[in-house]
Amino acid sequence: DNVDRDGVAAGDPVHHMWVRLTLDDEMVVHKAEASTDASPYSICGDIVSSLEALEGLAIMPGWRRGVIKCLGGTKGCTPITDLLCGPGAVTAHQTIFAAKERRKSAKPGKKPPQINTCHAYAQNSDIVRRQWPDFYEEA
């Protein structure tokens, strides 16, 4: 039973939250935001403004330590910390790296390094056909 929410119905999330980081090419956080739309307790969302403490940190070795310093213990929320240290950091690296590589590989005739690194960048995908038609190959 969840007293704060008068129970949690089947199919309803116990945790429903999001995190958004605005980064530069050096992986420095310029803005950090979060929202807790559903949580086990009504006070869980009170800490989302604490994410501002991440502004100025860089997602690089030591990121997890910095996140824990800013948001660990009673200053934060375990699921939000986990999002930041796990999928958030990985997604940031993939996004920034891909953008940097696209700019570097914009040289005519050079195959972009991201081709065939995932489903979206498969050499026979519509994305490759649109962005790098010279390197598109029919399946």
Feature names for model-found ranges:
Residues N2-A139:
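Active-site- and interface-proximal helix/loop "cap" or "latch" segments in soluble metabolic
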